[in-house]
Amino acid sequence: MRTREAIAYSNTLPRGAPTQDYPLVAWCDALVTGHADLGETLTNRSPEDTELVRLGRLEAQDFRSALAAAEPRQTAASKAAAQQAAAAAKAQWAPLLASQDEAARSQSFGLFYGLPGRCEHAARRIRNNITTPPATPADVGLEEPAAN
């Protein structure tokens, strides 16, 4: 677990993704929910597409349960950042969800490559109130420790 977490936290996040865990989980939830919502607009979903929607809903449920567990411990600023991050992610899906062009919606549904690996680790950390910094690649032996 520590090795996967170290790798996830060492990777650069996509443009627009929050760096703090609580807002990041809200952003991840909005992205995966938007993708599932888009998939549900398709009239001729393949079994694989239907499975992606199902898995997306499960992942979103996990993110929302983590957000709910962590919410009482968040500052007003963290909650506001989470709301802003979720709104920004939802806004990215809005034009596609409103589109009457099913072929374009289908193509966009197929282009969603998934969430950063950090999303699942951030959800675990906020759910379990883990406040220590995540492990680094050096901590888990993937890199040489920095020279002092």
Give the residues covered by each predicted segment.
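Short amphipathic alpha-helical segments and their helix-coil junctions
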Residues: 1-17, 93-103
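Charged, low-complexity, helix/coiled-coil-prone segments
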Residues: 1-9, 53-64, 142-143
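Short N-proximal segments of mature Sec-exported proteins
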Residues: 14-73
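Compact alpha-helical subdomains of small soluble proteins
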Residues: 59-148
